[in-house]
Design a protein with these regions (language model features):
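Acidic, metal/ion-coordinating pockets
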Residues: 2-34, 38-69, 75-77, 81-423
């Protein structure tokens, strides 16, 4: 499926995407009494109805996705229902209920974890090229209407380490083309490494990534630019908006009159307002947060509160990064949250930080269908999809973490599944 980006404005500003379709509601049916003389006709109608219901149920077991409308990545059977809390509809910026995207076509979004281009990854690029970094996962990234990751390092040759900071990343600029060639449409850069090489390094990174054809969210030349969304147009006409925010910053990283990152803390109302505005411009809103505590597999209360607030404001999918390990998934009011995807392209020294998943989410006006695809990241930071016992171990770990959050993942074959209807 060919994807069209909203490219008429970069981090210096971006115009509106498509308008959201109007609200609709399913019809209600009520059984009517019938006489003995009409029972034969009624029985025939009932049998036909049962046949239609069975056909619909069978079709629902398949997850539509991909740039050409193909099924979700193969590996198992049907999804299962999960828990979720009921609640009111999201409200618009004016305080009225936001219109439901009841007639929007479904879209598929693939989300991946922390991605950087320094240390072991930089050495790998020097030896094998940037495209080889994503060779093990690119087919999944390309299968969706949109794919995105958290870009955890500036991609620049500028060497200007931010003063007072103990860890500085400076990723190989060639990774920008690698991102685009792998099928990644959007990167979030709202994180605690975006300004590792100063404001000049940040602006150079944005320029390089956008020049490669990848949109950037969560950073910009000032606070207004850092809060701008990226918009991806699916070939079926649906529009997907992306926003990125961070709770984890170094002093001076926050965008203001000058370049920096978009922050969710301490004023979450700015995030909620941005989501509500975007919800009236696109069919689906996907939000990324850089948050939580490193190397812990349980979300803190602030993560849960912010994720729920984002969905209450109109987000359809919430993706978390920063802990460098997996945290569980949760269904809230029919929408999917994963609190941390861990690392995707990141060298590491521990088994836990090598375990991750790609989240393949099919969003529709009626709910979400999610497939989790297990990935293992090598010690030098290169990801590959895993099957068999290693893949199942990752899925079982996610299943346990998600159960603690009240959401059940079903494992079938080399994939895990979750499905929920919007509320």
């Amino acid at each position: 499926m060919t994807r069209r980006h909203d490219t008429t404005q970069s981090r210096s500003g971006r115009p509106n995407g498509g308008n959201r379709p109007g609200e609709g509601a399913p019809a209600r049916y009520r059984a009517q009494p019938f006489t003995t003389s009409r029972r034969v006709v009624a029985i025939v109608i009932a049998l036909v109805a049962l046949t239609v219901v069975a056909a619909v149920a069978l079709a629902a077991a398949f997850v539509p996705a991909g740039r050409g409308g193909s099924a979700a990545p193969a590996g198992g059977g049907a999804a299962t229902a999960t828990s979720g809390a009921a609640g009111s509809n999201p409200v618009s910026a004016a305080g009225s209920p936001a219109p439901a995207a009841s007639s929007a076509p479904s879209v598929s979004v693939v989300s991946g974890g922390d991605t950087m281009g320094d240390r072991g990854v930089k050495a790998f690029i020097a030896a094998h090229g940037a495209d080889a970094v994503f060779a093990g996962i690119a087919p999944v990234l390309r299968s969706a209407d949109a794919a995105w990751v958290n870009l955890e390092s500036p991609l620049t040759n500028i060497d200007d380490p931010y003063p007072g900071k103990d860890v500085h990343f400076r990723g190989d600029p060639r990774l920008a083309a690698g991102l685009a060639n792998a099928g990644i449409d959007v990167v979030n850069m709202a994180n605690n490494h975006a300004v590792d090489q100063g404001q000049a390094g940040l602006l150079d990174s944005i320029r390089r990534v956008e020049a490669a054809g990848v949109q950037v969210v969560g950073v910009g030349k000032d606070s207004a630019a850092a809060r701008q969304p990226a918009i991806v147009h699916a070939s079926n006409g649906a529009t997907i908006g992306f926003l990125g925010w961070t709770d984890i910053i170094w002093p001076g990283f926050q965008a203001g009159a000058g370049p920096g990152v978009a922050t969710a803390h301490p004023d979450m109302s700015l995030v909620e307002q941005a989501i509500r505005r975007l919800k009236h411009r696109v069919d689906y809103v996907v939000v990324c947060f850089h948050w939580g505590v490193e190397y812990t597999d349980t979300p803190i209360a602030e993560q849960v509160d912010e994720a729920h607030a984002a969905i209450d404001a109109g987000a359809d999918l919430v993706i978390g990064h920063h802990p460098h390990v997996l945290q569980g998934a949760q269904i809230y009011k029919g929408h999917f949250i994963v609190y941390s995807l861990g690392d995707l392209v990141f060298d590491h020294y521990d088994l836990a930080t090598g375990q991750t998943v790609l989240v393949h989410a099919v969003l529709s006006p009626h709910g979400v269908k999610v497939t989790l695809i297990p990935v293992y990241v090598s010690l030098n930071g290169i990801p590959a999809i895993v099957t068999g016992a290693p893949g199942r171990a990752i899925l079982l770990h996610m299943q346990r973490l998600s159960a603690a959050l009240g959401t059940r993942l079903t494992i079938s074959g080399d994939r895990a599944y979750v499905r929920s209807r919007s509320r």
